[in-house]
């Protein structure tokens, strides 16, 4: 069976005090991670945080290559789109 995907845009703040999903700023999900932006450490922390929040294995979350800035594009299974839309509608994320 073929899995469908969608793209989530995120803005990452590395070297934060805690790993957390802050909420939406327009269409962009703001995420804070404790890791430094070196050797992919912050990217891995973003993937781990989203995996936990969406109850997915990390292997189902893909960072689209080429993004070295704070703005990232994440490829997610289509089944997660309604969950993230709910976060956007509520104006916050209170799960973590």
From Swiss-Prot:
Disulfide bonds: none annotated. InterPro entries: DUF167, YggU-like_sf. This is UPF0235 protein CAB243. Pfam families: DUF167. One of its GO terms (cellular component) is cytoplasm. Belongs to the UPF0235 family. Transmembrane segments: none annotated. PANTHER family: UPF0235 PROTEIN C15ORF40. The lineage of its organism: Bacteria, Pseudomonadati, Chlamydiota, Chlamydiia, Chlamydiales. It comes from the Bacteria.
């Amino acid at each position: 069976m073929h899995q469908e995907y969608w793209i989530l845009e995120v803005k990452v703040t590395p070297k934060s005090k805690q790993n957390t999903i802050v909420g939406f700023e327009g269409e962009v999900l703001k995420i804070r991670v404790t890791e430094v932006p070196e050797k992919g450490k912050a990217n891995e922390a973003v993937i781990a945080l989203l995996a936990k929040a969406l109850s997915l294995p990390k292997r189902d979350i893909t960072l689209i290559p080429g993004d070295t800035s704070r703005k990232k594009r994440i490829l997610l299974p289509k089944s997660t789109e309604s969950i993230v839309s709910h976060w956007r509608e509520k104006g916050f994320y209170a799960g973590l």
